[in-house]
C-alpha cells in the first residue's frame, strides 16, 4: 500500500513541476512583420483564400486588426488573390474527380463568392461530362450498369461526387 502511495505522489510531483508552455504571442507584442512572414510562409506552400488565411493567422496571433491590415496589404501587393485561389482550387478538385456542385460548395466554405466560383466552374462546362466519365471509370471500371440496382449505385456515387444529372446521364 505504501508503495502505491509513493508512485502516486511521484506522478503528482512530476506533473506539477512541468510548466505549461506559454503562448508566446500573448506575452510578447506582435509585430505586423511577424504576421506577414507567417502569412507569406503559408502562401508559399499553396494559394489560400482570404478567409482561410485569416483563420490560420488567428490561430497563431490574437491581434485581429493587425491581421486584417496585413491581409489588406497582401491583396494590394497581389500576393493574396481570390481569383488565383479559385482557379487553382477548381483545377485541383476537378482533377481529383469532383463535380461542379461539390466544388462550388467547398469554395463557399472557403469564403469565395458564387459569382467568382461560377466563372471558373462554367469556363469549360463540356469538360464536366468527361470528368464524370473518368470518375465513374476509376470507381467502377468497365462494368456496365445492367440492372437497376447497379445504375442507382453509380448514380448515387456521381451525385455524391458533385456532378449534375445531365453531366452523367448518358454514361451510366
Task: List the predicted regions and their residue ranges.
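An alpha-helical, amphipathic repeat domain used for nucleic-acid recognition
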Residues: 1-172
